[in-house]
From Swiss-Prot:
Belongs to the bacterial ribosomal protein bL27 family. Keywords: Ribonucleoprotein, Ribosomal protein. PROSITE patterns: RIBOSOMAL_L27 (PS00831). Residues 1-23 are annotated as: Disordered. Pfam families: Ribosomal_L27 (PF01016). One of its GO terms (biological process) is translation. Signal peptide: none annotated. GO terms for cellular component: cytosolic large ribosomal subunit. The gene is rpmA. SUPFAM superfamilies: Ribosomal L27 protein-like. This is Large ribosomal subunit protein bL27.
């Protein structure tokens, strides 16, 4: 008689869903007010001119224009700005 014993249990087999973080609009791209520029955890990028910061640190455009990434300040922080054309 062919019998199959019970399979052993495992503690693996689960993973969290990806959060789709990162830069959504790159330098030189044209954006409209309200467009999301960066989704991030913490302030990897800081808001510059015409850019707002949401409670989850999402950066978004507050006016129409072109996206500009720049590094400035004594701590070499990365800033995202929207320059009006």
């Amino acid at each position: 008689m062919a019998h199959k014993k019970a399979g052993g249990s495992t503690r693996n087999g689960r993973d969290s869903e990806s959060k789709r973080l990162g830069v959504k609009r790159f330098g030189g791209q044209t954006v409209l007010a309200g467009n999301i520029l960066v989704r991030q955890r913490g302030t990897q990028f800081h808001p510059g001119l015409n850019v707002g910061c949401g409670k989850d640190h999402t950066l978004f455009a507050t006016s129409d224009g072109t996206v500009v990434f720049e590094t400035k300040g004594p701590k070499n922080r990365k800033y995202v700005s929207v320059v009006q054309a």
